[in-house]
Amino acid sequence: TKEVTNTLVGDDCEINGAARLSDCTLISTPQANVYIGTGVICENSIINYGSSIINSVKMQDSFVGEACQLSNGFTASSSVFFTNCYMSNGEACAAFCGPFTASHHKSSLLIGAQFSFYNAGSATNFSNHAYKMGPLHWGVLERGTKTASGAYLLMPATIGTFSVCF
């Protein structure tokens, strides 16, 4: 591990090869340890019981709840991941990810929305910007929503429970 600054590391955490941990809190127990792996850059974030952050994840200003897995170059900014989320390869910005939210495609971008029991298809993309005005809108994808490969949602939007978006 190259750099750990201003970081509270719980007794049962394992940090192995992280690039940088700065202003973070890693909360663990003997029954549910936190694992931080190779190449991880984490700034101003909280990582909770039983979570693993591995394989060059980049994260800032985020909260990772219990038993979450972030891996394979996933990038997160200003986002919340609650219990049992699985995020791999893609990106999240200002995402409120409820329990069991999953994204594992390189081209998926979760932005400005609330998710729960959500499965992001490959190349899923959200837009919440108006030209030159910055982010304006946010949306809700209710419990059990799935977006198909290449899905594009323009916010504001509310997608109902157990819906599939093409």
Predicted regions and their residues:
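Active-site pocket-lining segments that scaffold enzyme catalytic pockets across diverse folds
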Residues: L8-V9
